[in-house]
Amino acid sequence: MYRALTRDIEVTVDPYYLEEQSDPDDDRYVWGYKVVIANNSDVPVKLVNRYWHITDQNGQVDEVYGPGVVGEQPQLKPGDSYEYSSGCPLDTPSGLMFGHYEMETENGEVFNVTIPAFSLDSPGLMRVLN
């Protein structure tokens, strides 16, 4: 499990390999990841946008930026947490992901919350990127 803390907002990521959706013979490797965002601060925040930086084993980079996560822009009051799962396909057996969430407070202040870097490793594969 991977963790990052920004302004008392904790992001935890737990990646896992999806063998049933992967096909190594066709250079298709798929991972899922569960994210928990916990607002341990004393101010409500809204997740407005997400940014992902995804690097495969060959150094190929894909950047993803867009509104919310899994079609939602959750609002987290102090003490609230939000959990979602998503996935990432790659053409190589390993990779690395990191990024940030763009959060907004009730008074309109926008700030970035770090998503920790985490590795995507196929089972039985020596770790290449980390």
From Swiss-Prot:
It comes from the Bacteria. Residues 3-127 form the ApaG domain. Disulfide bonds: none annotated. InterPro entries: ApaG-like (IPR050718), ApaG_domain (IPR007474), ApaG_sf (IPR036767), Uncharacterised_ApaG (IPR023065). Pfam families: DUF525 (PF04379). SUPFAM superfamilies: ApaG-like. Gene3D superfamilies: ApaG domain. NCBIfam families: PRK05461.1. PANTHER family: OS05G0170800 PROTEIN. This is Protein ApaG.
